[in-house]
Structures are given as structure tokens and as C-alpha cells.
């Protein structure tokens, strides 16, 4: 138990949830973490949302599960191959909502990144950044 919430294993969670929102890095442990086996455990009205990294959800298995009505819907803004091939069946699947993986393209985010970068340059020239924190190529 963590913070009063019971921790359950992934298979049990998949059987119970309505929406699976993926937000994990792509590692050896998370590659194809959600494949046909896991999807087939989910409710028929379940929705998968992957906004983390392509490769976490097996795209071929997801498309098959959607075509077989194993789950109802998917929302994706990442793909195994980016940009995705134009023949990727998920691009044409009517039960998939696609959006660009572009959270940093808002005006506010771009402005904040620009200001932070400028401040880091000023800090560097004023000796406020330790040399061990500087990455050289």
C-alpha cells in the first residue's frame, strides 16, 4: 500500500480500468509493454492513450485488437517509427484519434524555454554555473 492506495499488478489493473493512459519512458522493460495479450484482458469499452513513447504499445497488436472489437478506442501522439509510415493502418483506423507529439509547441512553452536558455547563458558568463554541469561535445 502506498499513500493509502492499494498497488495491484498490471494484469489485474487492465481487467478493471476503463482508460489506460501511458506515460512511461521507452526502455527494455517498457518496450511492447502493452501487446495483444495485455489488451485482450481489458474491458470492451476500454480506451488506450499513449502519450509517452512509440514502442510502449505494440502498434500491430493495438490495430488488431481495435479491428476485433477487443477494446473500443485509442488515442496516440507517438508511434514506433516517427514520422509514421503512410501505410501504417492506425492512421486509417476510425477508432484511433491521432495528434502530434507537440506539447512544447505552445507559445508559453516556447517563451519559457527561450527565457530559461537565455538565463542559463547569462549565468554561465557570470560564473554561476559549475563547470561540471556543462556538457561539451
Regions from the language model: what does each represent?
Residues 1-44:
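Rossmann-like dinucleotide/phosphate-binding beta-alpha-beta segment
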Residues 45-47, 51-137:
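Rossmann-like dinucleotide-binding domain for NAD(H)/NADP(H)
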